[in-house]
Amino acid sequence: MAKLKLIKIDGSFETEPVKLSPGLIAKELKQQPVFDAVLVEQASWRQGTHSILTKGEVRGGGKKPYKQKHTGKARQGSTRNPHFVGGGIVFGPKPNRNYSLKLNKKAHTAALHTVWSEKLASDNTHLVDQNLFNKTEGKTKVMMQFLKSAKLLDKNVLFVVNTLNTNLEQSTSNIKNVQVKHLDKVSVRDLMLANALLVEKEVLKALEGKFK
């Protein structure tokens, strides 16, 4: 049975580890939903505001470049034609394209369950509580000292909480490699990018309800 230890403000651990409910660890790790979930998230970032100039939108070229006959060249009516350098683009991208993809709820839950299972079984995942958050007093200096004591300074740290704490948010806001996320806002990609995961104890109960 998987176990997690509660980490304290001085970087040490509680002696008694917390046993995880069997339902938190997926019986089967499904990688395809994980891939799909990350793809959907990244696709949602695309704004679709790209825009090229068509032949009718390129400035200039209103005058015929040279006379119709007796030049030995093919006849041309405008330098805005697509085959001229600086001319309009044919069938290029225009704004308001929707790049978003869809993933059904069951597949998204399977993706989260798979990634959470891998993280909860990892040695880089620990438990935290509101007591630790309050002891930071909202100070970056105290949080930095905690990360140093816990040997997490050089890692991408993700705090996952069930209740947002002002002291925690303030103490981590100026630290580049530290993120604080509410459980409902954590994505598959967030979990995968985290080298160290610090999970509030109450999150475990919420996850049991989500994955049962």
Swiss-Prot record:
Gene Ontology annotations of biological process type: response to antibiotic; translation
Membrane-crossing segments per the record: none
Recorded superkingdom: Bacteria
Effect of residue 70 to L: After 32, 37 and 48 antibiotic passages; confers resistance to various antibiotics in combination with a 23S rRNA mutation and up to 3 mutations in protein L22
Family to which the UniProt record says this protein belongs: Belongs to the universal ribosomal protein uL4 family.
InterPro entries: Ribosomal_uL4 (IPR002136), Ribosomal_uL4-like (IPR013005), Ribosomal_uL4_dom_sf (IPR023574)
Pfam families: Ribosomal_L4
Keyword terms of this UniProt record: Antibiotic resistance, Ribonucleoprotein, Ribosomal protein, RNA-binding, rRNA-binding
SS bond partners: none
PANTHER family (alphabetical): 50S RIBOSOMAL PROTEIN L4 (PTHR10746), LARGE RIBOSOMAL SUBUNIT PROTEIN UL4M (PTHR10746:SF6)
Protein name (database record): Large ribosomal subunit protein uL4
Task performed by this protein: One of the primary rRNA binding proteins, this protein initially binds near the 5'-end of the 23S rRNA. It is important during the early stages of 50S assembly. It makes multiple contacts with different domains of the 23S rRNA in the assembled 50S subunit and ribosome.
Gene source species: Mycoplasma pneumoniae (strain ATCC 29342 / M129 / Subtype 1) (Mycoplasmoides pneumoniae)
Gene Ontology MF term list: rRNA binding; structural constituent of ribosome
Gene: rplD
Signal peptide as annotated in the record: none
